[in-house]
Each structure stands twice: as C-alpha cells, then as structure tokens.
C-alpha cells in the first residue's frame, strides 16, 4: 500500500514536469528532466532530483534557475494540490545518471580491450 507521501511525490513530479514544459520562462532552464521526487512523511519538504543535458556551467545555471523559480512552483503546487501545507522544495542534481554513464563507459572499455586481446591471441 502506498504511503501518502509517495502519492504526493508523484503528484509533485507530474506538476513540476508540466511546469517545465509550459510555465517556466527562465532562459537558464534548458533541457531538464525530473528524475524523481521524495517527500518527507510530514509533507514539509519535497526534494526534487533533476538531470540536465549539457556542460557543468549549464547544470549550475539550471539549478540556479530552478531555485529562483521555487516560489512560483510552490504557488502552483498550492493551486493544484489540495493540502493544508504545501511542501518546501529543494532541487538536487541527480548524480546517478552520470554515475550510470560512467559505469557504461567502463564496461565498453573492458569489452573493447577483451575483443582486442582475443584478436591478438588468434
């Protein structure tokens, strides 16, 4: 059975994703993907995990843009979520995607070195 915080996290995820497509006009916010949302059990804090396609400078600019839009996003959450208290929002860059890319590149290196070793043995 779902906890209420998980349902709220899912609703926040959908709302922020929709706002990124339709509502936010900040030029610093580029190709952003919301990868997950965790809401505390007391519903006072929503941690929003995101990834960005681009350089480190673009990642930092996007995080600044998202942080400057927190008030607007929270206001929109208050309009659409029927809750007594609208959670505060914290944006965090999701390093798991970068970590996954790093693992994938290591596996490709291992695979290519094994193939070259097999060719040399033949």
From Swiss-Prot:
GO terms for molecular function: ribosomal small subunit binding. It is found in: Cytoplasm. The keyword Cytoplasm applies. GO terms for biological process: maturation of SSU-rRNA. It comes from the Bacteria. Keywords: Cytoplasm, Ribosome biogenesis. InterPro entries: KH_dom-like_a/b (IPR015946), RbfA (IPR000238), RbfA_dom_sf (IPR023799), Ribosome-bd_factorA_CS (IPR020053). Disulfide bonds: none annotated. GO terms for cellular component: cytosol. The keyword Glycosyltransferase does not apply. PANTHER family: RIBOSOME-BINDING FACTOR A, CHLOROPLASTIC-RELATED (PTHR33515:SF1). Monomer. Binds 30S ribosomal subunits, but not 50S ribosomal subunits or 70S ribosomes. NCBIfam families: PRK13815.1, rbfA. Belongs to the RbfA family. One of several proteins that assist in the late maturation steps of the functional core of the 30S ribosomal subunit. Associates with free 30S ribosomal subunits (but not with 30S subunits that are part of 70S ribosomes or polysomes). Required for efficient processing of 16S rRNA. May interact with the 5'-terminal helix region of 16S rRNA. This is Ribosome-binding factor A. The lineage of its organism: Bacteria, Pseudomonadati, Thermodesulfobacteriota, Desulfuromonadia, Geobacterales. The gene is rbfA.
């Amino acid at each position: 059975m779902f906890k209420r915080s998980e349902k709220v996290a899912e609703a926040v995820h959908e709302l922020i994703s929709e706002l990124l497509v339709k509502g936010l006009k900040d030029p610093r916010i580029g190709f952003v993907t919301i990868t997950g949302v965790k809401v505390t059990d007391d519903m006072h804090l929503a941690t929003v995990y995101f990834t960005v396609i681009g350089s480190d400078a673009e990642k930092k600019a996007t995080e600044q843009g998202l942080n400057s839009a927190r008030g607007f996003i929270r206001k929109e959450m208050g309009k659409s979520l029927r809750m007594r208290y609208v959670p505060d929002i914290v944006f965090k860059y999701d390093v798991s995607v970068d970590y996954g890319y790093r693992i994938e590149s290591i596996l490709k290196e291992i695979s290519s070195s094994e193939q070259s070793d097999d060719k040399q043995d033949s």
